[in-house]
Amino acid sequence: MTPPAISLVLPVYNQADHIAGVVESYVPVLRRVGGEFEIVLVTNACRDASPEVCAQLAAEHPEIRTLDLVQGGWGRAVRAGLALTTGETVGYTNSARTTPEILALCAAYARAYPDMVIKANRRIRDNWSRRFGSLLYNLECRALFDLPTWDINGTPKFFPRAYSDLLALQRDDDLIDAEFVALCRRRGYPMAEVPVLSTRRHGGTSTTNYGSALKMYRGAVELRRRMDGGR
C-alpha cells in the first residue's frame, strides 16, 4: 500500500465544541496540497466529549485515525501521534490556532521543498504579557541551543520522514518544540520559517500561565543539559 503524501498529527484537549469544524476544514486543504493524506487525532486527558467527536470523525473519513490517551501533555500527544504516521511528509500543529490557510501554506512549502523542515513563525501574540514571556523564552532557547529562530513553539511544523530523529522525540511536555528545533540544529536539518499573521483561537482556553511559563524556562536549561549528555 502506497503511503500518503502528508501525515498530520493534531493533539486535542477539551475541544469538543470546535474540533469537528476544524478538522473538516483541513480535509480539503490537505487533499489539494498533497493528494493522499492522513490525519491522526490524539485526544489526551480530555474532560469533555472530544474522544467521541474524534471517533465520529474517524468513522466518517477513512483518512482520519484517532487515539485517546489517559495522560495529558502536549509533547505526549505529539509523540504518540507521530508514532502512528506513515506519510512521506510528517507534521503536527496546534489545532486551536491553525487556520486552513496557514496549514495549506506550510504544507505546500513542505511538499515543494521535500528536504526542508518547515515551521510557522507567528508574528502576533494575544497580549503584551504573552509577547514578553514568549520573547524571554525564545531568547533563552536561542542562547542555549544556538538557534536562529524567533518562534520556538510555532506550528505547523512539517519535516520529511527521512529525518527519523524527529520521529523519536523524548519530551512529554511543552518542551517538545524546543527539543524539535534544537535537534534540527544539531543534526543539520535545513529549516525554513513561514511568517504567520494570525493567532486567533478557534475555541478553548490556552493552558499557558505564569507557572507553566516558569516551568518552561527551567525546562529549557534541563533540556540543554540532557542533550549534552547530562553535563
Task: Annotate each language-model stretch with its function.
Residues M1-A5, D17, V27-P28, D146, ...:
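Hydrophobic helical membrane-anchoring modules
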Residues P4-L10, I19, Y26, F37-V42:
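Hydrophobic targeting segments
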Residues Q15-I19, C46:
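Donor nucleotide-sugar binding loop of glycosyltransferases
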Residues F37, P51-L84:
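Conserved donor nucleotide-binding strand/loop of the catalytic core
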Residues E38, E63-R65, P148, P190-A192:
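Conserved beta-strand segments of alpha/beta enzyme cores
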Residues L41-T43, D68-V70, N121, P195-L197:
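Residue-level recognition of beta-strand->loop/alpha-helix junctions
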Residues T43-E52, R97:
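A conserved acidic beta->alpha catalytic loop
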Residues L69-G72, R76-L84, T89-Y92, P100-D174, ...:
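Acceptor/aglycone-binding surface of glycosyltransferases and processive sugar-polymer synthases
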